[in-house]
Amino acid sequence: MKVLTHWTLAFVTVIIVTLFHYNDNYVVETARLKSFDLLQQSDELVHSSDIGIVTIDEKALEKYGQWPWKRSVLAGIIWELRQADVGIIVLPILFSEYDRLDGDQELLNAIADNGVVIGQNGSFTANKNGVPRGVAKINDPLPFLFEWEGMLGPIPEFGANADGVGVLNTVPEIDGVVRRLPLLMRIGDDIYPSIAIETIRVAVGEPSYQVKSNAGGIDKMRVPGYPIIQTDSNARIWLRWNKTFDTISASEINRFHELAGKTVILGVTADGLTNIIASPKGGQYNYMPSAVSLQNILDGDTISRPYWAFLAELSTTFSVGFLICLLYTSDAADEEDSVDLGGRRI
């Protein structure tokens, strides 16, 4: 009967642990994400041949003055990049207010019909001056998209004339680490693409993009003329953080030609002027999710989690737990069957 008790206790324990895993609570999810981080940290670095970074760093501040610069300075950098024959120019910067230094017209001239994509941000306030983008839908994707109360967009002149306006928001995991990035978000019935999707759309010259959903969520999306992008049910992709990029200071105009033919992202890196985000590989500048997600899509190497992965995890949890309990109960049975003779157990 005691052996039966051991078996019963062991079996109940395995069932409880398996149900604990099935509920996918904080502990289980954190363990899963940390194991994902270990894989990312061992991933071989790959240098991008498609994307270059121009940084607003300390050297640039010494040359152009304190940030934010007069927008005519940014306009000058854009024209220098265009003169260097770069590809799409991405400014993951909010231009939600007019320039108090009266440089808006010069920047408008630089971004209008010039292959420039600028940023906007989802907001918890109900402002709706963002710039949505037309989308062809197969079934209704809205119930599955991350939703914001409002969208903090650029000033109307910039929003109407820039070739692209994309969302900059990240959605960190439960432990605050950025591992996935939504390619689409919503406000009400309006859908807003990420800055990576907008960059690809502008690069191929398409006015819109396509998204397909089913009863389980978002299935895939596509910019016409470009391969299908597999996402999770909430239109997110897992970021593969193994990318490195050619990086040049905004002060080094004479080196811009080194980025010829590449998509160029203008990112703020000067101390005190940018937020650092947590990634599986440590702290990153806040323009990096845009750069990494764009490179992942271009390479077609977005990380995917198979639909059967959760069932495989449950099966493994049950099998390993059952094996451990089997060994434990066997030892317990041996202990019960042993006999003490003369101080010795046989």
PLM regions and their residue ranges:
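Non-transmembrane functional regions of envelope-associated proteins
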Residues: 2-224, 259-324
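Short gly/ser/thr-rich secondary-structure transition/capping motifs
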Residues: 36-37, 247-250
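A short, sequence-level motif marking secondary-structure junctions
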Residues: 185-186, 244, 329
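A structural detector for beta-sheet-dominated domains
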Residues: 212, 224, 240-242, 342
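Conserved small/polar residues in nucleotide/adenosyl-binding loops
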Residues: 328-335
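Hydrophobic alpha-helical segments, chiefly the membrane-spanning helices
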Residues: 340-346
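Active-site Gly/Thr loop motif
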Residues: 228-247
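Surface-exposed ligand/attachment interfaces on beta-rich extracellular proteins
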Residues: 255
